[in-house]
């Protein structure tokens, strides 16, 4: 498998620290508000990555944190704690806000068929681990206390900002506009490991520490939680491209300083979902959620398909017109699968293996989900049995998770119910899109037969046959297909 590594800025052959096993970490949500669909694009693509690794035979352990303290509005060390901001907005406690939006996040994930990670760890569960890691960094000379806070000393590193290759003088003090420089820092790119009351005295969540009552910085959370559950060596760290700097840059700095060796082999970043005004984000005010899509009549799975049609390393522009096109594509795909007939015949293993190889080749190519979607249509066109096609589609859908077989089964039931309505002549398109002109001719043929005008009925049948259309008479109606 070739996978693009943000750390080295190139595609590399995937390898693991322990043969056959993958230690995978995902930056989880900051649970102060609903996730917007741009956030969820990252989790969809990470879900495909995890499922494809499992499909390929790896034993995957995936860990995700829940940030319920310490993530400031600047994404660096300035601004207001996002959790406190959410609590004030809704006049609730921070922990009430955290529980509500954690539950909401996983409800959205379930609707999008995003698998829950093996381990989900809220930051507030791991305060002892954070304190121990900060103490270790101080002991090793990589951290210092100033103004009551503990800072990581970036000047002690030979390399920093490995993701974006910025020169030192080009780096900004703050990530977002409107943040002030912290004068306690020895170097402008140092970052906070532990805050005390010298900052943000109204912070709702505080714990005792060797440096006074306070709370952890955002970056220390992911490092300590991943080391706790995955050990000192990690294979893949996932996240949105927003997190590459400063969050992931600072994670690498503190983790490798603490451990004394390379920490993570591959960094997997999903690019932005943009709307007509640019990058989608909560800081803009209103934003698109799964709930909003549902209220507009969209199945969340169609949004998943919309995401899979584009490569994860490309910015994806969201429009409702684009989502409408995904609806049409999805419905056509389901109609084609619904037309396949299940049977007890043996699987055509030669055909199945050829199709499997094409699907795996697509995803081995830097998780190219667009090519993997094309592989679905290759299955439908392949000269083999319907039973084999259904088997292979089910295997592929373990990775893509588009409800292909269950949606097709539902479609078949709907067609059966339509056919048995008393007194109705039902026309069903089999394996193709409905066509009003074809349906009108088939109904005219039925009327001619009822009037015993068999010559006219035969004429219409021959006309349709000349168009490449075969009619199959069934109880209560007719089916037609293109041949």
Question: Where do the protein language model's features map onto the residues?
Answer:
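Alpha-helical recognition segments enriched in aromatics with Gly/Pro capping
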Residues: 1-32, 47, 106-107, 127-341
């Amino acid at each position: 498998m070739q996978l693009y590594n943000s750390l080295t800025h190139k595609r590399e052959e995937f390898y693991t620290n322990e043969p056959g096993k993958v230690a995978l970490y995902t930056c989880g949500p900051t649970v102060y508000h609903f996730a917007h669909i741009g956030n969820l694009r990252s989790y969809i693509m990470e879900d495909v990555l995890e499922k494809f690794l499992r499909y390929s035979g790896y034993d995957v352990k995936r860990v995700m944190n829940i940030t319920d303290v310490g993530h400031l509005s600047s994404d660096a060390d300035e601004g207001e704690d996002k959790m406190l901001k959410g609590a004030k907005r809704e006049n609730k406690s921070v922990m009430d806000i955290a529980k509500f939006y954690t539950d909401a996040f996983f409800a959205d994930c379930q609707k999008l068929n995003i698998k829950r990670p093996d381990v989900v760890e809220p930051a507030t569960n791991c305060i002892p681990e954070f304190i121990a890691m900060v103490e270790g960094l101080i002991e090793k000379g990589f951290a210092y206390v100033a103004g009551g806070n503990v800072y990581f000393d970036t000047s002690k590193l030979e390399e920093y900002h490995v993701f974006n290759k910025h020169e030192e003088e080009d780096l900004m003090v703050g990530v977002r506009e409107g943040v002030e420089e912290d004068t306690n820092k020895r170097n402008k790119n140092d970052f906070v490991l532990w805050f005390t009351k010298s900052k943000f005295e109204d912070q709702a969540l505080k714990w005792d520490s060797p440096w006074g009552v306070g709370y952890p910085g955002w970056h220390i959370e992911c490092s300590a939680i991943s080391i706790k559950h995955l050990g000192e060596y990690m294979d893949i760290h996932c996240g949105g491209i927003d997190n590459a700097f400063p969050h992931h840059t600072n994670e690498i700095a503190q983790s490798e300083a603490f451990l004394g060796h390379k920490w993570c082999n591959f960094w997997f970043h999903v690019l932005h979902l943009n709307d007509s005004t640019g990058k989608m984000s909560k800081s803009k005010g209103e934003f698109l959620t799964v709930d909003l899509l549902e209220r507009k009549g969209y199945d969340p799975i169609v949004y998943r398909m919309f995401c899979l049609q584009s490569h994860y390393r490309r910015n994806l522009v969201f429009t409702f017109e684009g989502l409408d096109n995904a609806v049409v594509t999805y419905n056509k795909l389901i109609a084609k699968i619904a037309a396949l007939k299940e049977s007890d015949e043996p699987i055509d293993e030669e055909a199945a293996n050829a199709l499997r190889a094409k699907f795996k080749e697509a995803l081995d190519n830097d998780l190219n989900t667009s090519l993997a979607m094309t592989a679905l249509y290759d299955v439908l066109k392949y000269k083999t049995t319907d039973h084999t096609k259904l088997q292979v589609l089910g295997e592929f859908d373990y990775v893509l998770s588009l409800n292909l077989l269950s949606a097709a089964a539902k479609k078949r039931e709907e067609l059966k119910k339509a056919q048995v309505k008393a007194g109705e002549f039902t026309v069903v398109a089999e394996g193709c899109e409905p066509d009003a002109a074809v349906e009108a001719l088939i109904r005219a043929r039925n009327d001619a037969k009822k009037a015993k005008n068999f010559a006219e009925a035969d004429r219409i049948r021959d006309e349709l046959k000349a168009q490449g259309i075969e009619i199959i008479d069934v109880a209560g109606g007719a089916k037609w297909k293109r041949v």
